[in-house]
Structures are given as structure tokens and as C-alpha cells.
């Protein structure tokens, strides 16, 4: 333990000498004395015995203190001690004097902090603009909106004034009615109160008058019953009188008059000779021209077929059939595949119309043939009937 106590004054003297050197040395010397690993001033302040605290920081303890060798332990070599001291950030005043000039992570952190502060500033400014607005940019909105020329025309203003005046008039009428009704109610209320008071005071008088009221009611009921019975008798007598008068008039009128009236009523229904019954032909009925046709297209095409004309095609309106035929002969057609497709559609539609027209012609022909057969059969039957009746008459 005696060698340890002897070495303490030597350590104090060495630390004071090193502090003086550090304070007296120029900045160029300090920069050159930094270790290549970024350890700072560890090589200047680190001694063989251990680390010394920097000037002005007596209370700060080193992060990695090097303990003295105890009894029975081997002390560390000098190079390892200096490296350990130089690697610590607080050793030799490194924490207080180094500016991180060559550290890229420190520069990135500084830039991030600046960006974050700028964002916060911009956010606060935007919130302020959203709340208060920016009159230097947009200007303040007008307190009273300007009247629009389309919305506020003089005619509309007059109509609005009339409506407002009529509504005011109706409101005044309602108010007067309500005031009258309230006055009447107020007038009625005291009368009820008076009546109640009178009723309470003269309860005995009312008990005596109740019997009189009942008698009056019974008399009124009897009168009503008698009146109803008289009315029923009058109605019965009127009905009987009417029946008797009708019977007497029937007896007086002859039967010929009734026959003439019925005949005249029957003749009034139909005036003039009856029209002959005409069988509706199939030509008048709407014919189905097939599917995939526009409404009215089939009928319009059938009209051209009936007239014996060529059905006009798309783009041929205003041209005669002869002009169209001459154009087709000279080689004017639609362009390419579209012409082929349009031609196919046109041919299909025309075939539908022609087939429908042929069906109609066949149906009309069959109908005419049937009518002819029926007429022949009817004529032969009439001749046969006439012969038989004539032979009987001769006998």
C-alpha cells in the first residue's frame, strides 16, 4: 500500500503540467494532435497512470475510467491505456470542444432537425391562414352579397311584394279571428261561473223543475211520433192515388197506341237501310314482315314492292330508280367490307319483304278461290231448291 500513496503527488503534478500545455498550445497544434480514429485529445491528456478530468469540468466523471492495479493484479500496458482513453468521447475535453465536422451521421441528424423545424413552422403558418385567412392574397369577402341580374328582375320583385302583402293580409285576418274567438271564450267563461254559482245556490229549485222537464220531453216525443205517422199515411195515399191513375189511363188508351209506340222506338234505333256485311280481307290486316326490322320499315318497303318499284337503299334518298341503276352499272359502290355487310343486310330485309308479299298474294288468291267455290255451291243449292218448289206448285 506504501507505493500507491507515494505515487499520488506525482500524478497531481503531471495532470497540472498537462493542463497548462493544453491551454497554452495553439489551435493548429490541437488539430494535429487528434488521433486518426477520431479519439480526440486522448494522446495529450492520457498518462501512464490514468485519465484526468478536463478544465472547467471537475464534477464530470469519465465514462470509461481506468482503475488502478490492486495488490496481486498485473497493470495494463501503456498503449492499451492510451487507446481506451482516446476512444471515449468525454476524455480530455472531447465532449466540450469537438464540433463533429467529419461525422456524416451528425450532419444528417442536423439536416433532419432543420427540416422538421421548417415543417412545423409551415404547419403553424397554414393553420393560421386557414383560421384567419390571407387578405393580402384573396381579400375579404363582401358582407352584403351583390344582387344577381338574373335572380332579381323587376317582375319577380313585384310578384314577391304581392305575395308578401297577401301573406301579411292573411296573417292579420288570422290574428283578428283568434282575438275574436279569445274574447268570446272570455265572455263565456264568467257566464259559466255565474251559472255554477246559481246552480249551487238554487239546487232545491232545480230538483223540483226536473220533473217538469221530463214531462215536457215525453210530450215532445209523443208529438214527433204522431207527426211521423201522419207523414207515412200521406205517402201511402199518394202512392195509391198514382197507381189508380195509371190503371185508369191504361184502360182508356187502346192497344194500337202501345204497338205504334213500340214500333217507333225500334225504328229510332237504326235510321236508314242496314249496311251490307263486309268480310275484312287479309290485305287490311297488319302483316308480319319478319324480324330485325325498324318500326314501319317493312310496310314502307312493301309499298314499293306493290307499286313495282325498286326498294331504295341507304344513301339513295332523292334519286330515282333509273339513276340508281345507272350509278350501279358504272361501278359506284360503298367502300370495301362495309359495302358487303350492308349489301347482305339489305338483301336479307328485301327477301323478308318479298316473301311476306308473296305470302299475302297467296293468301288473297286462296281466299278468292274459296269465295268462288262457296258462291258456286250456293248457286247450285238455290237452283235445286227452286226446282223442287216449282214442281210442287205445278202439281
Curated annotation (Swiss-Prot):
Modified residues (Phosphoserine): 23, 25, 149
GO terms assigned for molecular function: chromatin binding
Top-level taxon of origin: Eukaryota
UniProt entry tagged with the keyword Iron: no
Annotated region described as Disordered, given as residue ranges: 1-77, 91-247
GO CC entries: nucleus
Biological process according to GO: cell differentiation; spermatogenesis
Tissues and organs where the protein is expressed, per its UniProt entry: Specific to testis (at protein level). Detected in differenting spermatogonia and early spermatocytes (at protein level).
Locations listed in the record: Nucleus
Keyword Transcription regulation applies: yes
Basic and acidic residues bias: start-end ranges: 109-130, 150-161
Basic residues compositional bias, start-end: 177-197, 214-238
Keywords: Differentiation, Nucleus, Phosphoprotein, Spermatogenesis, Transcription, Transcription regulation
Disruption phenotype: Viable. Males are infertile with reduced testis size, while female fertility is not affected. In the testis, germ cell development arrests at the pachytene spermatocyte stage leading to complete absence of mature spermatozoa.
Ranges of biased composition (kind: Polar residues): 25-35
Assigned protein family: Belongs to the NKAP family.
Assembly behavior: Interacts with RBPJ, CIR1 and HDAC3.
PANTHER family assigned to the protein according to its UniProt record, in alphabetical order: NF-KAPPA B ACTIVATING PROTEIN, NKAP-LIKE PROTEIN
Function per UniProt: Transcriptional repressor of Notch-mediated signaling. Required for spermatogenesis.
Protein name as it appears in the record: NKAP-like protein
Underlying gene: Nkapl
Amino acid at each position: 500500500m506504501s507505493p500507491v500513496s507515494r505515487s499520488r503527488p506525482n500524478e497531481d503534478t503531471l495532470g497540472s503540467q498537462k493542463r497548462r500545455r493544453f491551454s497554452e498550445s495553439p489551435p493548429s497544434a490541437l488539430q494535429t494532435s487528434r488521433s486518426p480514429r477520431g479519439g480526440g485529445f486522448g494522446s495529450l491528456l492520457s498518462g501512464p497512470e490514468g485519465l484526468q478530468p478536463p478544465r472547467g469540468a471537475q464534477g464530470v466523471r469519465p465514462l470509461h475510467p481506468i482503475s488502478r492495479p490492486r495488490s496481486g493484479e498485473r497493470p495494463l500496458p501503456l498503449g492499451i491505456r492510451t487507446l481506451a482513453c482516446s476512444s471515449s468521447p468525454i476524455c480530455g475535453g472531447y465532449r466540450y470542444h469537438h464540433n463533429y465536422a467529419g461525422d456524416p451521421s451528425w450532419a444528417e441528424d442536423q439536416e433532419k432537425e432543420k427540416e422538421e423545424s421548417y415543417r412545423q413552422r409551415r404547419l403553424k403558418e397554414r393553420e393560421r391562414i386557414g383560421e384567419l385567412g390571407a387578405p393580402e392574397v384573396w381579400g375579404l369577402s363582401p358582407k352584403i352579397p351583390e344582387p344577381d341580374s338574373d335572380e332579381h328582375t323587376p317582375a319577380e320583385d313585384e310578384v314577391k311584394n304581392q305575395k308578401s302583402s297577401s301573406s301579411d293580409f292573411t296573417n292579420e285576418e288570422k290574428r283578428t279571428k283568434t282575438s275574436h274567438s279569445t274574447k268570446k271564450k272570455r265572455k263565456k267563461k264568467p257566464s259559466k261561473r255565474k251559472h255554477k254559482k246559481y246552480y249551487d245556490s238554487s239546487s232545491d229549485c232545480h230538483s223540483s223543475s226536473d220533473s217538469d222537464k221530463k214531462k215536457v220531453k215525453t210530450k215532445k216525443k209523443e208529438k214527433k211520433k204522431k207527426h211521423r205517422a201522419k207523414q207515412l199515411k200521406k205517402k201511402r195515399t199518394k202512392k195509391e192515388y198514382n197507381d189508380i191513375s195509371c190503371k185508369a189511363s191504361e184502360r182508356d188508351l187502346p192497344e194500337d197506341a202501345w204497338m205504334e209506340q213500340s214500333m217507333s222506338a225500334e225504328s229510332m234505333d237504326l235510321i236508314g237501310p242496314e249496311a251490307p256485311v263486309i268480310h275484312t280481307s287479309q290485305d287490311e290486316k297488319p302483316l308480319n314482315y319478319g324480324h330485325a326490322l325498324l318500326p314501319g320499315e317493312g310496310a314502307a318497303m312493301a309499298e314499293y314492292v306493290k307499286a313495282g318499284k325498286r326498294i331504295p337503299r341507304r344513301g339513295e334518298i332523292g334519286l330515282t330508280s333509273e339513276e340508281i341503276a345507272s350509278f350501279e352499272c358504272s361501278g359506284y359502290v360503298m367502300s370495301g367490307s362495309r359495302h358487303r355487310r350492308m349489301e347482305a343486310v339489305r338483301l336479307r330485309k328485301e327477301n323478308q319483304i318479298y316473301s311476306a308479299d308473296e305470302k299475302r298474294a297467296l293468301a288473297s288468291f286462296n281466299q278468292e278461290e274459296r269465295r268462288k267455290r262457296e258462291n258456286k255451291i250456293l248457286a247450285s243449292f238455290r237452283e235445286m231448291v227452286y226446282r223442287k218448289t216449282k214442281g210442287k206448285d205445278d202439281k
